[in-house]
Amino acid sequence: MQYYRWAVSTFSFLFIFSITALSNANAATLTGKVAFQGTAPPAQIIKADADPRCKLMHPNGIAADEVIVNPNGTLKNVFVYVKEGLAGKTFEAPKATVVFDQKGCQYSPKVFGIQVNQPLEIVNSDDTLHNVHALPANSQPFNLGMPIKGMKIKRTFTKPEVMVKIKCEVHPWMRAYAGVLDHPFFAVTGGDGTFEIKDIPPGQYVLEAWHEKYGTTTQAVTVTADNQEIQFQFKA
């Protein structure tokens, strides 16, 4: 699958989602997509020559991943979540572990969501030194050197924050972002630009879409048992 990257400040994309009621306790599922409008420029290539093992895996360089436009005209790596409307509600941290890997001299996933106090397992799948330097403002920062292939370390974030930047000083092209929330209502757009957020109770909410390059956009929405479609549009 071929991706395109955007490297300038002008942009245009369309954020669309619909609300479909579930029969289970009146909860709803949010589905939608983030679409890019305009002509995508050629990809930028980053040389990996400084690390021989990275160069071996990427002899022609690594494609920059700050902005990825999918073949169907949608945007990848947009974090979508409920920003307002859950006051007074509490949600237990999941026991399921979120895995954050260093593979092919890149972070995977690039953008992810995790709940407060949910286990985060950090893995090095490469036979080279990486470090994971997380820079939260609300939780304790950490900087982990991981020189051994197969090495695993667990950490947690203790306070909500959108977004937490993660970087590797050894390989400066490696950047990732974690959306840390005290609820489970979030998703990240993938290779088709779509997202799905399940089991949202009826009510009035503010949803936010975050992108590494383009920042944030929000819109108020009323979740009911009726199907709905809402659009966010950005133009250069």
Predicted regions and their residues:
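Extracytoplasmic copper-binding redox domains, predominantly the cupredoxin/blue-copper superfamily
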Residues: 22-236
